[in-house]
Design a protein with these regions (language model features):
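Solvent-exposed, charged helical/coil patches
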Residues: 1-42, 116-123
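Basic, amphipathic alpha-helical patches used to engage nucleic acids or provide basic targeting signals
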Residues: 18-23, 46-115
């Protein structure tokens, strides 16, 4: 991954914008619950560009990426991505789209628990 001070390539920013406008139902629901500090005051960004990746949701204070997966996920690419991010100190919390839609409260509790633990352990 490039150093954090480098500007993002224009195409990377544009792709993140496109992903924000074509969100899945699960992403829309979760974003409604995460935006504007609604989850315990935690600040999340959606479709956050972190080259070479774009993270579904990212909490910088906790260095936590939340990825919502459908049936197309779960392969070697996801494992390599998680490994790359973990080397940067970012934990990846993978959840299924169905979970976000059907068990929203449980998903939010898990995100809050993990984020809170990471923030507390960083002090």
């Amino acid at each position: 991954m490039p150093p954090k001070h480098r500007p993002l390539p224009a195409w990377h920013k544009q792709r993140a914008r496109e992903l924000r406008t074509t969100a899945t139902d699960a992403e829309v629901r979760l974003w409604y619950c995460l935006r504007s500090g609604r989850l315990g005051g935690l600040k999340f960004r959606r479709q956050h560009p972190l080259p070479p990746y774009i993270l579904d949701f990212y909490c910088e204070a906790a260095k936590l990426a939340v990825e919502l997966d459908g049936s197309q996920h779960g392969g070697e690419d996801d494992a390599a991505r998680a490994s790359d991010l973990e080397r940067e100190g970012i934990m990846v919390l993978r959840l299924w789209n169905d979970q976000a839609l059907k068990e929203t409260e449980a998903v939010l509790q898990e995100i809050y628990r993990v984020a809170s633990e990471r923030i507390a352990s960083d002090r």
